[in-house]
Amino acid sequence: MLEDGKGGITTIPGLNQIQFEGFCRFIDQGLTEELYKFQKIEDIDQEIEFQLFAETYQLVEPLIKERDAVYDSLTYSSELYVSAGLIRKASKDMQEQKIFIGSIPIMNSLGTSIVNGIYRIVINQILQSPGIYYRSELDQNGISVYTGTIISDWGGRSELEIDRKARIWARVSRKQKISILVLSSAMGSNLREIIENVCYPEILLSFLRDKEKKKIGSKENAILEFYKKFACVGGDPLFSESLCKELQNKFFQQRCELGRIGRRNMNRRLHLDIPQNNTFLLPRDILEATDLLIGLKFGMGTLDDMNHLQNKRIRSVADLLQDKFGLALVRLENAVQGTICGAIHHKKIPTPQNLVTSTLLTTTYESFFGLHPLSQVLDRTNPLTQIVHARKVSSLGPGGLTGRTASFRIRDIHPSHYGRICPIDTSEGINVGLIGSLAIHVRIGNWGSLESPFFKISDRLTGVRVLHLSPGRDEYYMVAAGNSLALNQDIQEDLVVPARFRQEFLTIAWEQVNLRSIFPFQYFSIGTSLIPFIEHNDANRALMSSNMQRQAVPLAWSEKCIVGTGVERQAALDSGSLAIAEREGRVIYTDTEKILVSGDGKTISIPLVMYQRSNKNTCMYQQPQVRRGQFIKKGQILADGAATVEGELALGKSVLVAYMPWEGYNYEDAVLISECLVYEDIFTSFHIRKYEIQTHVTTQGPEKVTNEIPHLEAHLIRNLDKNGIVLQGSWVEPGDVLVGKLTPQVVKESSYAPEDRLLRAILGIQVSASKETCLKVPIGGRGRVIDVRWIQKKGGYGYNPEKIRVYILQKREIKVGDKVAGRHGNKGIISKILPRQDMPYLQDGRSVDLVFNPLGVPSRMNVGQIFECSLGLAGSLLDRHYRIAPFDERYEQEASRKIVFSELYEASKQTANPWAFEPEYPGKSRIFDGRTGNTFEHPVLIGKPYILKLIHQVDDKIHGRSSGHYALVTQQPLRGRAKQGGQRVGEMEVWALEGFGVAHILQEMLTYKSDHIRARQEVLGTTIVGGTIPNPKNAPESFRLLVRELRSLALELTHFLVSEKNFQVNKREA
């Protein structure tokens, strides 16, 4: 918390605040702006006029609750009503009605939207800001070529370039360019105006020939010349209105509309004073841009850095929703126009309500949330994941970059990112550097820029002391880089401090400093701010840690970290997983479903989340932390959520770890664990799987949900009720029926059983033939049924389709194959679970819980884990928790090492454990082999770091194929666990098998188990009858496919079989 100039307190802003502000700006301003753009609609004879009144729009409170929208697959939306008027000019009567024009998805308290029952988030997009940018490139001869790129608000680009002869060209396409005089004339300027408004008229006149004069003799000639170059049309086209309209739609509207931000940038770069409401590119802009380009040619002026954040803008959720609302109104305008014409043609009297359809706005937003690249399914693995996802900023998407074409310079860290975009937290893989995360204190300004706060170094009498500066503005100040937490001006700083000035790092006297950062974590994202001792880690490992914390599974019994950074509480508060008291009062009732609070004569019911499934199948829940009769204050925590303890983020567990090799079981990042982690449920987590089935109408009739399923064993349907649906609370195993369903089908006369034919012949009873299509528990799906949802939707022709969802809760202990990780990029796979008596143990008799490989530390340069490990041990012995700010070496040299050693020394003295700190090898200790009782040869580093269990679990990945589908072309098994696919034996695997000489196993893998059709059939027959499986004598299907492919290239390939006995050649067709 920081003191501002008015005596108030400045804290970390709400981490979801950017999403809330964007949506509120759309509701308050965006809707009104687009409704004002809605033009009056008239019929052909101009007898009827329709218009919307933007001042009187109204949003209705959603009719359903968030929880019901999730469970029933509905959209949590608000209905929009606008007053509309229909004027009949003959009688001058106006009929006004409040009409419903559609539903708009509403943002909830998490900063997300619920569309069709799915939580979705609209992430911010960072784009090149509209305006003009000058740059220089070297041509093939090493000569600098200067260009000016004009970027429109739509993302379209036009380039001005100057050649060796100082001629100015405007490039309208990749291959076509025209003279700047032709472009200016086509935009409405004559030659005299051009000469009078440029600084270098002699340069423009130097290449003006008779042919050029004819082209710019009139506006029509200039437009025709421009159209020929732009549309690549030969001959002499004739001037017409349609030609001008085509140019307007395809060029001027897409490349010359600057928008509000573009006009501001253009005025600032070219030193113009054109009004802000004039958002189109003007001839004056072109001429001023030409002057500046000529000046750059002669060494005057400066080039632009297009990767600087002052040349970027943020396209927030408000801009995206406003664009889609404008698109829906354009569609509505066309629909109303057609409806008016149809009503007049059929001589009907229209009303405003009859003219407007609400489906256009609703379907526009549903398609946006479902199909737009920037609208993504909210990642809800743990509370931290939700916050980080909402604070992402992407360079991808419409109008942005692509992962294939983005250069290294665009992906790299820029000095202007400091305090605005985290230099650590980004995606791994092809999108590295293109998807970033906003810094913890950043905010979005009015012009779409990222603003970072700074503390102003001045006298106490000056006004506000915390300034929010946009990119570029802070470069004019001396900004102290390494400064302490205290902002009291009376504290004497060092005489010389490091500082930033104009993207350079300097060392200056303290008196010259103008600004300083307000928080040690100001430069990092929320995920990176949770890493203690981050300054001792390599940046690549810090990046991995930021990403892996988002993959941590909420555990059954969470635990606060011993060593943290202090940001854990803010992350938990803004995640929405906690229940917070909205007013003072007294708790009168509490259970697992709700908390009742009485205050001011009112009783408020606060519902709690109980066993809610996230989209990553993790279990979200809330546990009450207050008692009946307890008095509470506003803002007090009433209930903890998943992965939170006492209002702090708790993603993992602090366990006893030793860094040592152990019989090769922790080779190459493998991890050895004790069985007590399994039996004591240390890393046990709950997961909820959702299984769904839907009834359809077939040509033979509707499908039926029932518990009378023929040809199924009784124990498979033991859990079904009378309706054929599994009972809530049942324990189910793989293969059990969750929902019994029969599908009618056509059966031939010959396929009836004898008793069925007898019933038909004697009694005339029609035997129904149905196919069993039940919903069954898949392999690895055992668990407890915690919820069953039966959803009926209204269908046509008197049939209501049914959708049944079954939720199964699974308890998963940690096992071999699961992935665990620390907070420093140190990750590994469980390789073996040892009995606790075989694990290494300490001098006080405690056995180690987990063994890491020490070779994983020096090469990866993530030494922060060593500090956390040792300080965690001291904290567990002293029963203390530490919150460490990053870059503490600015206070004194070796500050991290000193605090760790001092705490270990204090722990060894106060707890009578002298082994905790041994001066010969501080931080290490002599430990014993649990199998023999002997001490290990060398002292071992032991401690209590914070370990996370990640979502990558072996239960979701392990797979074996007994039988399955084959690809149609290659006849080889499909790929992937979901398709019951096989494991590919590639080229290198074949080499390995050849190296060991296992010829029969290799032949089996390449024929029987792969794509030899006849051999597969013979294996089945031989298995049933018994005997020896014969060796395949012809080529497999993949070889036959290769032959056919070569034949398509007119290459004939034949093969021969040579007998081993008499070497006779037997030729067969491939």
Curated annotation (Swiss-Prot):
Swiss-Prot/TrEMBL catalytic activity: RNA(n) + a ribonucleoside 5'-triphosphate = RNA(n+1) + diphosphate
A GO molecular-function annotation: DNA binding
Gene: rpoB
Organism (species): Cuscuta exaltata
GO BP annotations listed: DNA-templated transcription
Alphabetical UniProt keywords: DNA-directed RNA polymerase, Nucleotidyltransferase, Plastid, Transcription, Transferase
GO CC list: DNA-directed RNA polymerase complex; mitochondrion; plastid
Superkingdom of origin: Eukaryota
EC number, as in UniProt: 2.7.7.6
UniProt protein name: DNA-directed RNA polymerase subunit beta
